[in-house]
Amino acid sequence: MAQRIFTLILLLCSTSVFAGLFDAPGRSQFVPVDQAFAFDFQQNQHDLNLTWQIKDGYYLYRKQIRITPEHAKIADVQLPQGVWHEDEFYGKSEIYRDRLTLPVTINQASAGATLTVTYQGCADAGFCYPPETKTVPLSEVVANNAASQPVSVPQQEQPTAQLPFSALWALLIGIGIAFTPCVLPMYPLISGIVLGGKQRLSTARALLLTFIYVQGMALTYTALGLVVAAAGLQFQAALQHPYVLIGLTIVFTLLAMSMFGLLTLQLPSSLQTRLTLMSNRQQGGSPGGVFIMGTIAGLICSPCTTAPLSAILLYIAQSGNMWLGGGTLYLYALGMGLPLMLITVFGNRLLPKSGPWMEQVKTAFGFVILALPVFLLERVIGDVWGLRLWSALGVAFFGWAFITSLQAKRGWMRVVQIILLAAALVSVRPLQDWAFGATHTAQTQTHLNFTQIKTVDELNQALVEAKGKPVMLDLYADWCVACKEFEKYTFSDPQVQKALADTVLLQANVTANDAQDVALLKHLNVLGLPTILFFDGQGQEHPQARVTGFMDAETFSAHLRDRQP
């Protein structure tokens, strides 16, 4: 019995040993594309569901999903919102993980109609697949007017849009708006109206009435926030379109110009007059009348409040978040009401004296609003140009603040001026690098000199012309993030270049993914990119030396040493 157990253990160990002997050390750790993104479809008359089961550690690009009908007509396809993914070279992109279900409405399909579905994805470990195309056969569908409406796509774990400010900023903005020239001088008058002209109210009573007034104003703003957030939720996909983002950028820029005094934005004077008359008919000093006065006051926008309020509303529309929408506008109204409550309780002695500084506060808010166009444009133009826009905005703001501070006479302002000047110098650095190209020239001096090939025949010819030298073939594509990382961090390393000094360097750019590219990848049995192949002097590949996925310079140098005989 003991002998049998010993024999069984020996067989199991031998099996694992032999498996290890024949297991290629260079075998890819990544699965084929159909396992990474298991695609399936199901049609029921006009309704077609496309599904992707996405393997853990992999993701699909939202912008790379394309659907093209052949001999069929489909409704507009609305892709659900994904989650944001960011990398160094392509900036922010929306991706899908775990599972994606995409409903498609088929308005009409002839016999033999098909749907061509193209998609592309990557692995978190630094490996990207070429664009994959699937052909979906369609059952014949007769045109039906009821099916012509676009499908409402369920939002799969809809994330909150990543916006640059928290709702708490709205409170600070509201307080800041209170010190603009259109608002601050009105507070004593508003305080008198709220109290109904009664001078001998107790402090608690005066504070209560003012608080009720502020809550009425906050109710109006909160309702605006909820409505705009609900509208933004319905049109969330459209709000992410580049043309819409550019349009919003123009609107925000115009709002900022109004804060600089170049434009004037406010409600029509006739409408403001009607709202003011309605407010004046309310009885001051009573809770009900004060609340209605505050509600109406929230609709009366002065030139100083129109631009910030519009900016916050558009900001909320971008989020599509109901809680954020209502909460942000409530805090904004509360911020505007805090100075009024203080004045009502403590009197005008707390008010700072009016002067040019109020115009400077208004101008400063113009720069705050200008930050939103930069944030929106960053999604369209990428992080590189986005950084340059942030740099330009920083230089403009700190430069303006420095010039404005020169009018101050107090000694401690000299310290502030030095800080502002230093901040402007730091902000200008990205623009300086762009203008003089310092970083670019440093990088271009260290690239490897690859010979480009395109087809299988060109590869075979290059292997023959190597004349006994070892050959390295780098498969590259513009859509491959890790390929760019190889270029920037690995191939630029002096140790890597030294190790490849006696190696013939070939590169195949398969960005187009055309028939020749597909044939080359199939011939070499390549799943995705980056993939680097090594051939000996006789033109035979060493499969165990194949590299799939990104390697840093140190790891790649060690890999090159290990492959040497």
Swiss-Prot record:
Catalytic activity: [protein]-dithiol + NAD(+) = [protein]-disulfide + NADH + H(+); [protein]-dithiol + NADP(+) = [protein]-disulfide + NADPH + H(+)
Keywords: Cell inner membrane, Cell membrane, Cytochrome c-type biogenesis, Disulfide bond, Electron transport, Membrane, NAD, Oxidoreductase, Redox-active center, Signal, Transmembrane, Transmembrane helix, Transport
Entry-linked Pfam families: DsbD_N, DsbD_TM, Thioredoxin_2
A biological process from GO: cytochrome complex assembly
Signal peptide: 1-19
Enzyme class: oxidoreductase
One of the record's GO cellular component terms: plasma membrane
InterPro entries: Cyt_c_assmbl_TM_dom, DsbD_gamma, DsbDN, DsbDN_sf, Thiol_diS_interchange_DbsD, Thioredoxin-like_fold, Thioredoxin-like_sf, Thioredoxin_CS
Disulfide bonds: 122-128, 182-304, 480-483
Record-stated family: Belongs to the thioredoxin family. DsbD subfamily.
Function summary: Required to facilitate the formation of correct disulfide bonds in some periplasmic proteins and for the assembly of the periplasmic c-type cytochromes. Acts by transferring electrons from cytoplasmic thioredoxin to the periplasm. This transfer involves a cascade of disulfide bond formation and reduction steps.
Name of the protein this chain belongs to: Thiol:disulfide interchange protein DsbD
Species, as recorded: Escherichia coli O157:H7
Taxonomic placement: Bacteria, Pseudomonadati, Pseudomonadota, Gammaproteobacteria, Enterobacterales
